Regions:
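A short, structured beta-strand/loop element
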Residues: 10-13, 17-20
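Long, amphipathic alpha-helical surface segments
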Residues: 5-8, 21, 26-38, 44, ...
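Core of compact, soluble alpha-helical bundle domains
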Residues: 1-6, 16
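Residue-level detector of buried hydrophobic side-chain packing
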Residues: 13, 67-68, 96, 120
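Alpha-helical scaffolds flanking conserved acidic
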Residues: 58-67, 94-98
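Extracytoplasmic
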Residues: 8-10, 62
Length: 129
């Protein structure tokens, strides 16, 4: 399918895979799962590489999950330079989780992104004091 939220629109397959995808490509369910595992690992590692020691030590499993989801959705470069990561690297975990909710635009305000960010925020703050 053509992801029309992206600018410019980008051919996409499975659960948001875009690298090397051409319109008309077909994948099996097993191939999609394998692609998702590989891409999720790549995005998770990209997020982790943007952390300072303070940011890394501030992680809970829930913060890690929320930021990995955000990174998969908006990209490693966008997350790495974000206020959310800057706050996390400063040890401001709650502020970092709040900043996740700011990513609701994809060229224009995208209604589908608001509930996603709310879910990521709820995951991110789970267990925080």
């Amino acid at each position: 399918y053509l992801d029309r939220i992206a600018s410019p629109p980008v051919p996409t397959i499975c659960s948001g895979i875009t690298v090397g995808v051409r319109m008309g490509d077909v994948r099996t369910r097993a191939e999609c799962r394998a692609d998702l595992r590989r891409e999720a690992q790549r995005y998770w590692q990209g997020f982790r590489n943007s952390l300072t020691e303070t940011g890394y030590l501030s992680l809970t499993v829930w913060v890690d999950v929320a930021f990995s989801s955000l990174t998969y959705n908006i990209g490693i470069g966008a997350v790495s330079g974000s206020t959310a990561v800057r706050r996390l690297n400063a040890g401001d975990v709650r502020g970092a989780c709040e900043a996740l909710t700011w990513w609701t635009r994809a060229g224009v305000r995208a209604r589908i992104l608001f509930p996603r960010r709310q879910r990521e925020h709820a995951i991110c703050i789970r267990g925080l004091p």
